[in-house]
C-alpha cells in the first residue's frame, strides 16, 4: 500500500469523514482511519497514449502481486467459516441437497455470529482485551435477510477476487462489520490471524468459543434439520475416511490466509472425532443458538428406528424376519413416537436422541429376546437349526447363530485390522507445515522437505505398492451377496427354529430374559450404568463389540443404551426391584 501516491485523493471518507487515504494493491483508495475501501481507483492522466487493454486493466484495479509472506488480514471466525463451507461442499458431493449449505447451515452460522457478537449486530465485539470502536453498519438484530450471503458464494467466502471487487454492480460478501482500529492492530506477530492470540486467551462467560470439532456439530444439526440420510456415526466415519475435511481442514485455506503461531492451537487437530464428545457439542451448539423445535421424525424418515433397524440388520447380515421383532420392540417401548424422537433444544425437558445408537440397541434387545445370549441357549438353538438344514436342503434354511457368529467374527476381524493399519499409517502432519513464527518458517519447511524425501526413499527401498485410490463413500461397511460362498448371506434365512406357533401368533421359544442392568445409578456421575466385560456372557460381549465397531463408539456407551431400552420394555420388572429395595430400606430403619 502506497500512502504517498494516495495524497492526491482529497475526498472525505463516507464512513468516518476523515481525509487520510492509502492505496491498496489492487489500486483502490482505502481510509487509513477506518479501513473503508472505496470503489474509486487511481485515475489516469492521459488515456490517449494507453491502449484499450491497459484501460480495462485500470478499470479493474491495478493488479499487483501481493507478497504472500504477509497475506490477507483475516479473523479466526473467517477461518471456521471457510472450514464450514468446505464441509458443506463435501456433504453436497455425498448427495445432500444444496439447501443444507445455502439455507440451513448458512442461517445457523449467521445466528452464531450474531449470538457471539462477532457480526450481524450493531456493536460487534471481536476481542475482550483489545478496545475497538465499531461503526454502526446499519444492521438490526433480527434482519438477517438483508445481509450479504456468507456460505453461498465462491469458495473464498469473505475473500473475493480483485476483479470482482472492482465491479460496482456486483454485491460482494461482507461477513464482518467495519472496524476502526489503529494500523498496529492490523498485524499480529504471534499469529497469522488478526485475533489469534486474543481468541485463544478469551474466556467470556456465556459465549461459546468456536472450535474445529464444533464445525461437525453445525454440520450434523443441519443434517438433522433437513432429515438427511446421514447419521452422526456416518458423519464421523466419513470424516475418518477423509471424505469430509476435518483433520487437515486448514490445508484448504487460500494461500493468502497465513496460519501460524496461536492459529496452530485453534485449527490444528491431533485426534479423531469421538462420538460422545461431538454429541455433547451438538447439544451445546443447539442450546447456545436457541434453535427452535426441529422438524418431526415420522415413520417415513430415515432416522426413524424402524428404518434404521432395517439398515443395521442388513449391515450385520441378520435375517430380514428379525425386522418384525425390532418393530415390536419399538412399538412396545414407545421410542418410535414423534414426541419421543423430536429434538427441541429450547424445551424445558429437552430430549436428545442418539438415533443410530438407539436403533442398534433395539437389535441387541431383539437378539436377547430370541437367543437369550447366555452362552448356552443360542448354541442349543444352533444345533437344532444345523440338523434341520442338513435334512431339508431344498427348503428355506433356518438361521444358524453359530454359523453367523463364525462368518461375522472373521469379517469384523479383517475389517478391524484394515482400520487399525489405516490409522497407524495416517499422516497427522499435512502438506502445509505449521510454524509458530515467521522466523521458524524456513526451518519447518526444510524439515518437511527432508521428511518427504526420506519417505520417498524408504518407499522405494521396501518396494511398497502405490497408494490405492479412495473408495467411494457408502452408508454400508459390509456387502453381503448370495453368490459369495466364503461369506454366506443370512438375509433370507428363516427364524422358524426360534419361534413357535401359539394361537394365531408366533412367540419365541425362549421364555427367559436377563436384564443388562439390574439397578441404575442415581449419582451425579451422569452414567446410567457401568459395563464390566467379565460380568457378561461372551455372546453378549461379541454383539456389543460388533455394533460398537460399526458405529465407532465405546462398548459401555452401547450397553447403557441397551439398558435404557430394557427399562422401557420391562417396566414391571424394574418396578418390582424398586419396591423390594424400598421395603428393605424401611426394615433397616425400624
Swiss-Prot record:
Positions of Zn(2+) binding: 13, 16, 31, 34
Keywords: Acetylation, DNA-binding, Metal-binding, Nucleus, Transcription, Transcription regulation, Zinc, Zinc-finger
Entry keyword annotation includes Zinc-finger: yes
Domain of life: Eukaryota
Primary localisation category: nucleus
Location of the protein in the cell: Nucleus, Nucleolus
Region B-reader, annotated ranges: 40-68
MF terms in GO: RNA polymerase I core promoter sequence-specific DNA binding; zinc ion binding
Signal peptide as annotated in the record: none
C-terminal cyclin fold: annotated segments: 263-373
A GO CC term assigned to this protein in UniProt: RNA polymerase I core factor complex
Zn finger (RRN7-type) location: 4-39
InterPro entries associated with the record: Rrn7_cyclin_C, Rrn7_cyclin_N, TAF1B/Rrn7, TF_Rrn7_Zf
Biological process, per Gene Ontology: nucleolar large rRNA transcription by RNA polymerase I; RNA polymerase I preinitiation complex assembly
Pfam families: Rrn7_cyclin_C, Rrn7_cyclin_N, Zn_ribbon_RRN7
Modified residues (N-acetylmethionine): 1
Cited PANTHER family: TATA BOX-BINDING PROTEIN-ASSOCIATED FACTOR RNA POLYMERASE I SUBUNIT B
Subunit structure: Interacts with FLNA (via N-terminus). Component of the transcription factor SL1/TIF-IB complex, composed of TBP and at least TAF1A, TAF1B, TAF1C and TAF1D. In the complex interacts directly with TBP, TAF1A and TAF1C. Interaction of the SL1/TIF-IB subunits with TBP excludes interaction of TBP with the transcription factor IID (TFIID) subunits. Interacts with TBP and RRN3. Part of Pol I pre-initiation complex (PIC), in which Pol I core assembles with RRN3 and promoter-bound UTBF and SL1/TIF-IB complex.
Annotated family: Belongs to the RRN7/TAF1B family.
UniProt note: domains: Although it shares weak sequence similarity with GTF2B/TFIIB, displays a similar subdomain organization as GTF2B/TFIIB, with a N-terminal zinc finger, a connecting region (composed of B-reader and B-linker regions), followed by 2 cyclin folds. The RRN7-type zinc finger plays an essential postrecruitment role in Pol I transcription at a step preceding synthesis of the first 40 nucleotides.
Function: Component of RNA polymerase I core factor complex that acts as a GTF2B/TFIIB-like factor and plays a key role in multiple steps during transcription initiation such as pre-initiation complex (PIC) assembly and postpolymerase recruitment events in polymerase I (Pol I) transcription. Binds rDNA promoters and plays a role in Pol I recruitment as a component of the SL1/TIF-IB complex and, possibly, directly through its interaction with RRN3.
The protein, known as: TATA box-binding protein-associated factor RNA polymerase I subunit B
Organism: Bos taurus (Bovine)
Name of encoding gene: TAF1B
